[in-house]
Amino acid sequence: MRKSYRVKTERDFQKVFKEGQSMANRGFVVYTLPKENQKHFRVGISVGKKVGHTAVARNRLKRFIRATLTELKPEIRPDLDFLVIARPYARDFDMGRTKKNLIHVLRLAKVLSSEETEIEEK
């Protein structure tokens, strides 16, 4: 995912935290903030040290989240900034469980424009 699709600055992160709405499941919390006049969505990903004690574990989960979001890119509403925060429960997720849980919470948060997202089991 290109840099233009990322929430980068601390100021932008804090704005989404403070002014946005949150939705959660056991694995992830998603904060959303509608933004008008935006060409495409922007996403921030946070995986704290409580989730994985090593950088390898945290980066692996971030890769899974980014891969899922890249796959869902056509279905994500373009008028949003949103943050995906991993919870400690997501520590041992493989790609399939990450995708399933992330799609679930994105549906709850109304980030996906269509309700008919297919979950492919591999």
From Swiss-Prot:
Reactions performed catalytically: Endonucleolytic cleavage of RNA, removing 5'-extranucleotides from tRNA precursor
GO biological process assignments: tRNA 5'-leader removal
Pfam families, sorted: Ribonuclease_P
The name this protein goes by in its record: Ribonuclease P protein component
Family: Belongs to the RnpA family.
Keywords: Endonuclease, Hydrolase, Nuclease, RNA-binding, tRNA processing
Subunit structure: Consists of a catalytic RNA component (M1 or rnpB) and a protein subunit.
Transmembrane residue ranges: none
Species whose genome carries this gene: Lactobacillus johnsonii (strain CNCM I-12250 / La1 / NCC 533)
Lineage of origin: Bacteria, Bacillati, Bacillota, Bacilli, Lactobacillales
Enzyme's top EC category: hydrolase
Assigned GO CC terms: ribonuclease P complex
Function summary: RNaseP catalyzes the removal of the 5'-leader sequence from pre-tRNA to produce the mature 5'-terminus. It can also cleave other RNA substrates such as 4.5S RNA. The protein component plays an auxiliary but essential role in vivo by binding to the 5'-leader sequence and broadening the substrate specificity of the ribozyme.
